[in-house]
Design a protein with these regions (language model features):
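C-terminal motif of bacterial Sec signal peptides marking the signal peptidase cleavage site
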Residues: 16-19
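An acidic-aromatic pocket/loop used at catalytic or ligand-binding sites
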Residues: 21-138
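Sec-dependent N-terminal signal peptides
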Residues: 6-12
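Positively charged n-region of N-terminal signal peptides that target proteins for export
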Residues: 1-5
Length: 138
């Protein structure tokens, strides 16, 4: 009995630490991107471990935030990333916003052949920071 209780406790602790086996997705593979593309947009210090994950609805929607404060370099990287997404055949730009010097946002959605509906990406940047938001139904 004691052994079963310890086994159960170990299982619960393992699930708590691993998020019930759910791993943060490798975004570059979801978009058909190579790792260099993600490294570029995140800056040198960004890794999958530094992405904040938060629930945004009761339906299992998860939002991933990639944020970096990098001044002009950050703007350059964000524009590169935006242009990359715009050029990808399986990324559809579904909305964009006021384009100003140093301030731009756009929403991208993968076409239905690549992923189920509900996947949305937003790229935004200002003079001091840039953020990539990714929402994914799990």
């Amino acid at each position: 009995m004691k052994k079963k209780l310890l086994s159960l406790l170990f299982l619960v602790a393992t699930l708590a630490l691993t998020g019930c086996g759910y791993k943060k997705p490798e975004v570059h593979s979801m978009l058909g991107m190579n790792i260099k593309s993600i490294t570029t947009v995140c800056g040198t210090d960004c890794s999958m471990d530094t992405i904040d994950t938060s629930s945004t609805s009761d339906h299992g929607m998860i939002t991933y935030y990639y944020t970096d404060v990098a001044g002009d370099k950050g703007i350059s990287d964000a524009k590169t990333y935006y242009n990359y997404l715009k050029s990808e055949k399986h990324c559809i730009k579904i909305d964009d916003f006021d384009e100003k010097k140093g301030n731009y946002s756009a929403y991208f959605q993968l076409n239905e052949k690549q992923v189920k509906s509900g996947f949305l990406m937003k790229v935004s940047f200002t003079k001091n920071s840039y953020t990539v938001y990714i929402e994914d139904n799990i």
